C-alpha cells in the first residue's frame, strides 16, 4: 500500500515534459493511448496554481448567532432584505450561508456588520 501511495505521489508531481515521456512509453511499449490520462495529470499542477490566485468571489457564512441572537436576526433581515421569519430561520439554522458571490469589500462589510451585532461569521 505504501508503494502505491509513493507511486501516486510521484505521478502527481510529474512535470509536463515527464508526462509526455510517460505517454510515449505507455504507447510504444504497452499499446496504451494515454491521451486522457496525460491531460488529467498535466492539469493537476495547473489547478493547484489557480488556487494560489486571490479569490474574487466570497460567501458570507453565519457560524453562530452568539449571545445577541435578536440583534443578529435584525442584522440578517436588513442585510438580506428578508422577512423576520426568514431571517430568524437562517440564524436558527446556523451554520448557514447569508450571501453568496460577493466582492471582497462587500463580503467584509457584511461580515463586520454581523460581527458587530454579535454573530460569529466566516468568509469562504
From Swiss-Prot:
GO terms for molecular function: mRNA binding; structural constituent of ribosome. The keyword Signal does not apply. Pfam families: Ribosomal_L12, Ribosomal_L12_N. The keyword Chloroplast does not apply. One of its GO terms (cellular component) is cytosolic large ribosomal subunit. CDD domains: Ribosomal_L7_L12 (cd00387). Keywords: Ribonucleoprotein, Ribosomal protein. InterPro entries: Ribosomal_bL12 (IPR000206), Ribosomal_bL12_C (IPR013823), Ribosomal_bL12_C/ClpS-like (IPR014719), Ribosomal_bL12_oligo (IPR008932), Ribosomal_bL12_oligo_N_sf (IPR036235). GO terms for biological process: translation. Homodimer. Part of the ribosomal stalk of the 50S ribosomal subunit. Forms a multimeric L10(L12)X complex, where L10 forms an elongated spine to which 2 to 4 L12 dimers bind in a sequential fashion. Binds GTP-bound translation factors. Forms part of the ribosomal stalk which helps the ribosome interact with GTP-bound translation factors. Is thus essential for accurate translation. Belongs to the bacterial ribosomal protein bL12 family. This is Large ribosomal subunit protein bL12. It comes from Bacteroides thetaiotaomicron (strain ATCC 29148 / DSM 2079 / JCM 5827 / CCUG 10774 / NCTC 10582 / VPI-5482 / E50). The lineage of its organism: Bacteria, Pseudomonadati, Bacteroidota, Bacteroidia, Bacteroidales.
Amino acid at each position: 500500500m505504501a508503494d502505491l501511495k509513493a507511486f501516486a505521489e510521484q505521478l502527481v508531481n510529474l512535470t509536463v515534459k515527464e508526462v509526455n515521456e510517460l505517454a510515449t512509453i505507455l504507447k510504444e511499449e504497452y499499446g496504451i493511448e494515454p491521451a486522457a490520462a496525460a491531460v488529467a495529470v498535466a492539469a493537476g499542477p495547473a489547478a493547484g496554481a489557480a488556487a494560489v490566485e486571490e479569490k474574487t468571489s466570497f460567501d458570507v457564512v453565519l457560524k453562530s448567532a452568539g449571545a445577541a441572537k435578536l440583534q443578529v436576526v435584525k442584522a440578517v433581515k436588513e442585510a438580506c432584505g428578508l422577512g423576520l421569519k426568514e431571517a430568524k430561520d437562517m440564524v436558527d439554522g446556523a451554520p448557514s450561508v447569508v450571501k453568496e458571490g460577493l466582492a471582497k469589500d462587500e463580503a467584509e462589510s457584511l461580515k463586520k456588520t454581523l460581527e458587530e451585532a454579535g454573530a460569529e461569521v466566516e468568509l469562504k
